[in-house]
Amino acid sequence: MDVINILDELTRVLVDAADVHQAAAYTTGSGVAQPTGFVTALAGGSSVVASGTADTLAAGDVFNVQNALPARFQARAQWTANLSTINALRQLETTNGALKFPELANGQLLGRPMNECSDMDGVINASQTNHILAYGDFNNFVIVDRIGSTLEVIPNLLGANGRPTGQRGAFLWYRTGSDVLVDNAFRILNA
């Protein structure tokens, strides 16, 4: 009876794998044999906003990122960050113990939608750049998919010794690309 739904299960597994692969590429892809991720496209350019204190996330940094975005792009701007960064912002309190960003409970930050992107930096590492928070008009980030995909069934997988392992495999091939159209439509925080 296990064979009845094998194609449905195989489809589910392959679609999930493609989604995970695409999410990473659309965020940090290099643009060489893969899509250009929005973090990669913005890193090192004028869209980067440095944190007030190196290797630290402070409430003032959030305001600085939002203020740095030109008015032209503010109307459709949204936030995106790793869940660790979102949770760090949720924990920020005033000296009286009130939350600095209580609207994060409703998926908003400073009046704009907040989106989770697990492929962004979530831990601040002192030895590298940390692009932990992005804000901008994502209508200026384009994703292009070529219609169709190819699934190749591999009847015998080979081990390191070049002999069959008794396992079967599948290779899913599809084409996709992405890039930022207008760098000025985004700001990204480097903590």
Q: Residue ranges of each PLM-predicted region?
A:
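Structured, hydrophobic secondary-structure cores that serve as assembly/anchoring elements
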Residues: 1-191
